[in-house]
Amino acid sequence: VPDPAIYICNPDDELMRPPDHESWFILVNAPRQTDPNGPDNQPGTLDWHTPGLAQDYADRVLDRMAARGLDVRDRLLWRVVRTPADLEAETGAPGGAIYGTSSNGQRAAFLRPANRSGIPGLYLVGGSSHPGGGLPLVGMSAEIVSDLVGDA
């Protein structure tokens, strides 16, 4: 993504930073992780395991921030770069998609996971489950699960 939107969170939590320092969380949109078992050269995907790719992308994000007047590069004590490949490995989200499965296409709404899972007592709620993302739909998802739990 050549010019990504950059979300910055600056929590004031002494447990997250050394004294007299700041802690920052920076989030940018990034292409999904390529399925190593899928077809090559899928549009909009990258192999985030490629050596140097993640660090180079993180450097570009810091460069974009500097170009926009927020240069923090010389103030970094350390950084942790997490990629879509990391998110996929840690959460099982396909391609490391932070917003769940794709919402594009006529059938997408019907392909989201149901609110009641196959495991007794485990319910799914939020933007990645039925009926989908966005605050109103997440609220509806919570109401559905509340009704299901009430019936359990």
Q: What are these language model-derived features?
A:
Residues 82, 150-152:
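Active-site-proximal substrate-binding core of FAD-dependent oxidoreductases
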Residues 107, 127-150:
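A conserved FAD-binding loop/helix module that cradles the flavin
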Residues 1-84:
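C-terminal segments that line or cap access tunnels to active or ligand-binding sites in enzymes
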Residues 3, 56-60, 93, 137-144:
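Generic recognition of stable, solvent-exposed alpha-helical segments in well-folded globular domains
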Residues 11-15, 29-33, 103-106, 128-130, ...:
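Short, glycine-/Ser/Thr-/acidic-enriched flexible segments
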Residues 24-25, 41-45, 89, 93-95, ...:
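General N-terminal targeting signals
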Residues 2-7, 63, 67, 71-131:
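A glycine-rich dinucleotide-binding beta-alpha-beta segment and adjacent secondary-structure elements
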